[in-house]
């Protein structure tokens, strides 16, 4: 998202970035927060094209000529419909393509930005972990094996106060 913001700024555009997640918006939300996106659309909160345009107008009124919109593939309209142009063999919505759909719909009604769409798709799963990620994974794995060796189950390994520990699953939920 950071790189797309730089591209949006340097070319005076609005970048629409479609991310995976199906019916859960946490990937889009966390990507948007980490990348400082201007708009984030998730399945849990229905959207309107008018609402998106209103936000883009606010951005423009503040003197900015660029914006970043992060959209989860499973977003829903106000009436609860998944935005999808395709259906599978049993009539369920096939996810993907919502970024281009939004680009087309917004462009028809608001011309103050040029829009470009990027679909991250499986690239989201292929980032290179930093050293801390690798260390944390190793520590979590070691703790999980330790718990199993001790005959403990129904626990989740966590990082708390700078240490690896475990909590009972019912306490997590």
Q: Model regions: which residues?
A:
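Accessory alpha-helical/coil subdomains and C-terminal extensions
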Residues: 1-114
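C-terminal non-catalytic interaction/assembly regions of soluble proteins
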Residues: 94-173
């Amino acid at each position: 998202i950071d790189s797309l913001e730089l591209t949006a700024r340097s070319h005076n555009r609005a970048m629409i970035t479609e991310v995976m997640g199906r019916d859960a918006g946490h990937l889009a939300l966390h990507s948007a927060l980490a990348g400082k996106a201007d708009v984030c659309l998730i399945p849990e909160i229905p959207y309107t094209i008018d609402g998106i345009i209103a936000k883009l107008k606010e951005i423009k009124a503040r003197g900015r000529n660029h914006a970043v919109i992060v959209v989860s593939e499973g977003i829903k309209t106000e009436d609860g419909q998944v935005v999808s142009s395709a259906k599978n063999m049993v009539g369920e919505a096939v996810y993907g393509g919502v970024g281009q759909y939004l680009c087309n719909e917004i462009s028809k009604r608001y011309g103050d930005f040029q829009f470009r769409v990027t679909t991250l798709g499986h690239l989201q799963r292929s980032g290179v972990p930093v050293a801390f990620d690798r260390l944390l994974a190793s520590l979590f794995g070691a703790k999980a094996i330790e718990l199993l060796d001790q005959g403990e189950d129904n626990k989740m390994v966590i990082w708390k106060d700078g240490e690896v520990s475990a909590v009972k699953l019912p306490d997590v939920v």
